[in-house]
Amino acid sequence: NNFYSYNAFITAAKSFPGFGTTGDTAVRGPIQISYNYNYGPCGR
């Protein structure tokens, strides 16, 4: 659906070195899954 490309995501993530790498599960907390309510409209 071309919301953003894989390469654009990787480039943006590299701008934030702590993205997905900082803290442990106690600090980050549980994964938040809310079905597709937040992301579904992005692909339309």
From Swiss-Prot:
Its EC number is 3.2.1.14. Keywords: Carbohydrate metabolism, Chitin degradation, Glycosidase, Hydrolase, Hydroxylation, Plant defense, Polysaccharide degradation. GO terms for biological process: cell wall macromolecule catabolic process; chitin catabolic process; defense response; polysaccharide catabolic process. Coiled coil: none annotated. It comes from Capsicum chinense. The lineage of its organism: Eukaryota, Viridiplantae, Streptophyta, Embryophyta, Tracheophyta. Belongs to the glycosyl hydrolase 19 family. Chitinase class I subfamily. It is an enzyme of class 3 (hydrolase). Pfam families: Glyco_hydro_19. It comes from the Eukaryota. It catalyses: Random endo-hydrolysis of N-acetyl-beta-D-glucosaminide (1->4)-beta-linkages in chitin and chitodextrins. PANTHER family: CHITINASE-RELATED (PTHR22595), ENDOCHITINASE A (PTHR22595:SF184). This is Endochitinase 1. SUPFAM superfamilies: Lysozyme-like. InterPro entries: Glyco_hydro_19_cat (IPR000726), Lysozyme-like_dom_sf (IPR023346). Defense against chitin-containing fungal pathogens. GO terms for molecular function: endochitinase activity. The keyword Hydrolase applies.
